[in-house]
Curated annotation (Swiss-Prot):
It comes from Syntrophomonas wolfei subsp. wolfei (strain DSM 2245B / Goettingen). The gene is rlmH. Specifically methylates the pseudouridine at position 1915 (m3Psi1915) in 23S rRNA. InterPro entries: Alpha/beta_knot_MTases (IPR029028), RlmH-like (IPR003742), tRNA_m1G_MTases_N (IPR029026). S-adenosyl-L-methionine binds at residues 76, 108, 127-132. This is Ribosomal RNA large subunit methyltransferase H. Homodimer. It catalyses: pseudouridine(1915) in 23S rRNA + S-adenosyl-L-methionine = N(3)-methylpseudouridine(1915) in 23S rRNA + S-adenosyl-L-homocysteine + H(+). Keywords: Cytoplasm, Methyltransferase, rRNA processing, S-adenosyl-L-methionine, Transferase. Its main location: cytoplasm.
Length: 159
């Protein structure tokens, strides 16, 4: 099973990027994982709802280019299901046994994701009911994927 994290927003802060890269590297012995970021369209601070929806549609077109039919799409959204680390590990195990080629985690930028992209998802999860900057959410997600694999292997890390 391969994994992919798509972050519509670019990871600009070096400390977040270094952390994400570290967890992706640590995942190497367990799975193949890649990060795609920077699909975000520019939007002015005074954009109205109509302009925001148009931007979300443009971002949706970019996202679709990265999606495959033979994958599990997992959208991260504040309204998604919150899981414990142990539950996340069990879900990783189920996805690994699904016969699909890849699991793609998708995180929107500041204005979220187009509804049509959300509706394509097989799963919608939330890291927390708290709101995080998208860069931090990518880092937390990468860490939780790593933690999940460590739990599944019964290896020390998770306490």
């Amino acid at each position: 099973m391969k994994y992919r994290i798509i972050s519509v927003g670019r990871i600009r802060e070096s400390f977040y990027l270094e952390g994400v890269r570290e967890y992706l590297k640590r995942l190497g012995p367990y799975t193949s994982i890649e990060l795609i970021d920077g699909l975000e369209e520019k939007i002015g601070p005074r954009a109205g709802e109509k302009e925001i929806q148009a931007i979300l549609q443009k971002e949706a077109e970019k996202i679709r280019r990265w999606l495959d039919k033979d994958e599990i799409l997992v959208v991260l959204d504040l309204e998604g299901q919150v899981r414990s680390s142990e539950e996340m590990a069990r879900q990783l195990e189920k996805w690994n046994a699904s016969g699909k080629s890849r699991v793609t985690f998708l995180l929107g930028a500041a204005h979220g994701l187009a509804n049509e992209i959300k509706q394509q998802a097989q799963e919608t999860i939330s890291l927390s009911r708290l709101t995080f900057p998208h860069q931090m959410a990518v880092l937390i997600l990468a860490e939780q994927i790593y933690r999940g694999f460590k739990i599944l292997k019964g290896e020390p890390y998770h306490r």
